[in-house]
Each structure stands twice: as structure tokens, then as C-alpha cells.
Amino acid sequence: MSIQLPPPIALYVQLENAGDTETLSACFAPNAIVRDEGQTYEGLAAITAWKAETKKKYHHTVTPLDVAQQHGKTVLTATLTGDFPGSPVTVNFAFVLEAGKILSLEIHA
């Protein structure tokens, strides 16, 4: 069974798995916020730097398992596989979308 992801999330997963950290910023609104590993990244420059750093450090890929609407967010449950202890892990990506872009993303294991 194939999972139907909203276009900005589908593009995020595609670019994430391709390691295209520069183009990945095109998925986000200019004022987007990302929360990951206890840190907050605000704006496209910070998000691009965060993604480049995490990709270099973990060499990870995302495999979607499920998607659901919860409390106004689109929550993608996925397997995250990479060079980190405990890999693979199941992770929730909680997206808020606006005007075809990612306005916020919170990542929780």
C-alpha cells in the first residue's frame, strides 16, 4: 500500500533521501521553524544549515510508514535509518503546512 503524502511533505522526503540539502529549503516557508533534538532552527538559512549538518553527521534516510492529521498538524510516522546508535528508529515528523509550504516541523523519536 502506498502512502499519499501532501506535496510539500512528499518533496521533503524525496529531497531528504536524495541528500539534496540545498533544494530542501524550497519545501519551507521563509519564516519556517524546525525543532529537532532539543534545538530550534528559524528561517531558511538556519534550516538549510541544520539539514546539511544532520545529513553529514548521520547519512540518514526516511521511509514513510503512516500519515495522519492530529491537532492541526500532518504527522508522518517514518523509519529513520542512518549512522547513529539504535538505527533504525521510528520517528514522528509533525508538519504544519501553509500555502503549499512547510511552516513548521517538529521531529520526535
Give the positions of each predicted feature.
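Structural motif
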Residues: 28, 70, 98-99
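A short gly/proline-enriched turn/hairpin at secondary-structure junctions
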Residues: 33-42, 57
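Surface-exposed, charged secondary-structure patches
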Residues: 51-92
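Short, well-ordered alpha-helical segments enriched in acidic and aromatic residues
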Residues: 8, 18-31, 35
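Hydrophobic pocket/interface hotspot
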Residues: 12, 23-24, 32, 43, ...
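Short beta-strand edge/turn micro-motifs at domain boundaries
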Residues: 90-109
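Hydrophobic/anchoring residues in structured secondary elements
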Residues: 34, 67-69, 107
